[in-house]
Amino acid sequence: MSGETLEFQAEARQLLQLMVHSIYSNKDVFLRELISNASDALDKLRLASMRDKDLDVDTSDLHIAIEVDQDARTLTVRDNGIGMTRDEVVQVIGTIAKSGTAELLRKLRETTDAETSQELIGQFGVGFYAAFMVADRVVLVTRQAGEADGTHWESSGEGTYTIAPATDVPQGTAVTLHLKPVDSEDNLHDYAAEWTIRQIVKRYSDFIAHPIRMAVERPGSDDSEPTTEVQTLNSMKALWARPRDEVEPAEYHEFYKHVSHDWADPLEVVHMRGEGTFEYEALLFLPTHAPLDLFSPQGRRGVQLYVKRVFIMDDCEALMPGYLRFVKGVVDAHDLSLNISRELLQQDRQIQVVRRRLVKKVLATVKDLKANQPEKYRTFWTEFGAVVKEGLIDDTENRDSLLEILSVASTHDPAEPTDLTGYVNRMKDGQSEIYYATGENRTTIENSPHMEAFRAKGFEVLLLTDPVDEVWVERVGEYDGKTLRSVAKGQVDLDTDEERSAAEAERERQRTEYADLLTWLGSALADQVREVRLSARLTTSPACVVGDAHDVTPTLEKMYRAMGHEVPQVKRILELNPTHPLVSGLRKAREQGATEDSLTETAELLYGMALLAEGGELADPSRFTRILAERLARTL
C-alpha cells in the first residue's frame, strides 16, 4: 500500500514520546480510552442519522467489538460509528490544538515522580496516545459514514506516521495494537488474554451505553471441536438512573473519567433526580483540577445531554452557566424531543427549570464542602474560584449563594483566606464598610501606599488579585448591609470622632500651608491628574494616586482595551503626604523661588513614583529615568 509519511506536530511528538516511555503505572487505562473514543463515535453516528435524513446508515446494531489474536499478539478495538476522513485523522491524531500544551509538556519532562506524572497527564486527557504505552505499533483503519473510501494510518510512535487511502473498509474505525511483550515489572500485562480484557472492561467501561462484544472460544465437550461464541462484556446500565446507594465510588470515578477524559478521580459527585411535571436525572462531577482550556474561548463547555438514555449532544451550554463550565457529567431529560437543536434549547422552558435546579444543587454542594470538608473546598476554590466569581457579575438569582462560598485573601492571616462573614465578624466597632484592595499579586497590594493608613490603624483589608475581582466588587456593591469600599478610591478617614476632633487644628494648618502648592501642582500636572489634594491615607509614602468612588480602575481600563473596547482614559487624583520630607521640601523650594523647570521635574517624579508604587505604568519611562538619573547624580 503506497502512502505518505508525515511527522507528528512537535507537541504531539513530545507527548507521544512521553507515552511510549511512560512511567505511568496503570497502563490498563489504554483500553478505557479506546473504548471511550469508540462510544463517542457511535453516539455521533446516531445523532447524525437523526439530523441528516440524507445520510443512509444502519444504526440498528451500534456496537464495539474487541478482537484478540494470541499468536500475533494483537488487540483490535472496532466500532461501526461515524468514522473519520483523512483530514480528520491528521487533525485528531497528528496534531494537538489545546492551549497550555507547551507548559504541560515542560512540567512532564521535568518530573520523575509517577504520581505527579499521572496528575499532569490527567490534566491533558491523552486519549488515543495511551495505546503507545502498551503497543510497539498502532494501526488505525477508518471510513466515515457516507463516504466511499477509507483511510489507513500507522505509526510506531517514533515521531512519524504513514497515511494512505484504503478501499473495502467497513464504516467506522478499527484500532489494532501490536502489543509489547508482557513485562510484570513495567506493569505490562497480557492484553491478548480474555480474562485480562474482561477485567479491564468490567472495571472501566461497564456502564458504556453500547454493547462491547468479544468472540470467546469455548472448549468442546468430549471429542467435539471448540466453539466460538460472541459475548457482551458490559452491563450497559445507565449509572445516572441507578439509586445512589447502589453505586460504588469506583463506578462513579470511572464514569467521570469516561465523560471528562480526565485521568484523575473527581473531587465530588452530584447525583440527583428531578420529578414532577418534568422528570430528569443528573450525574454531575466537580473535577479535582482545572482543565488547561478553562479560560480559553475555544474550551469545552457544559455537560452531556441525553433524552431517555439516547445521547443528544456534548457540551450542552444551555444546562450550565459559563461560570460553572468546568462541571462535567450527564443530564438525562425524559420529555424533550430527540431532534431538539442547541438554539431551541436556549429558549426551552423545561431546560431553563433544570438549569436553575442544577446550579442551585452544585452551589449547595460546594457550600457543604466548605462547612464539612474544608480540605476539599480549599482544593475546589484554588482551582476554580476565579471562574466561579464570574457568576457574581450576572447571576443575580444565585448571588447570595455565591457570596456564601466566596473565599478571599486578607490581611488578617497571610496563610488562610477568609469569607465575607468572617470579615464582618471581625470588623472594628463603628466600622461600616468592608475594605478591599485589588492588584496583580499580594505583595504588590500589601506594599501599595493605599494600604498604609489601614495597616497603621489595624483595619483588615481583603486582597483581590484575580482580574474578575475588579468587576464583581463593583457589581455586588455590598454584603450584609456593609458597603464594599476600595482603599484606592475616594477620601479615606479612619479616625474616630475623638481623633478627628483632636487633629482638626493640625489639618487646617496643613490645608492653609499647602494651598498654594496644591494649586500649582494641579496646573503643572493638569494633563495627568484632575486634582491634587492632601491625603489622610498615607503614613510613610510621599504620594499616591487614587480614583473617585465610581471611577473605572486602571486595571479595568486595560482589560477593556485588551478586549477591543474603546475606553476613555480617566484622570485620577494625586494625594500628597504633608508630613513626608519630599513633599514638604517641594513646598519650601517653591516658596524660596526654585526654578519652574526644577519644580516641574520634581512634580513629574512625585507623580511617577506614585504610579509605580501601585504597580502602574509610566506614560514616558525614558523621561522619568533621565530626570531621576540627573537628580541622583547631583547628590554624589
Swiss-Prot record:
> Which PROSITE patterns does this entry report, sorted A to Z?
HSP90
Q: Does this entry carry the keyword Nucleotide-binding?
A: yes
Query: In which domain of life is the source organism classified?
Result: Bacteria
Region (C) residue spans = 559-636
Q: Name one GO molecular function term.
A: unfolded protein binding
Keyword Chaperone belongs to the record: yes
**Which UniProt keywords are given for this protein, alphabetically ordered?**
ATP-binding, Chaperone, Cytoplasm, Nucleotide-binding, Stress response
Signal peptide location: none
Region annotated B sits at: 343-558
The record's listing under Pfam families reads:
HATPase_c_3 (PF13589), HSP90 (PF00183)
Q: Which cysteines are joined by disulfide bonds?
A: none
Q: Where in the cell is it found?
A: Cytoplasm
Residues of the region (A) are 1-342
GO CC terms of this entry: cytoplasm
Q: What family, per the record? A: Belongs to the heat shock protein 90 family.
Described by its record, this protein's role is as follows:
Molecular chaperone. Has ATPase activity.
What the entry lists under NCBIfam families is as follows: PRK05218.1 (NF003555)
Q: What binding partners and quaternary form does the record give?
A: Homodimer.
The record's section on HAMAP family has:
HSP90 (MF_00505)
The identity of this protein, by name, is Chaperone protein HtpG
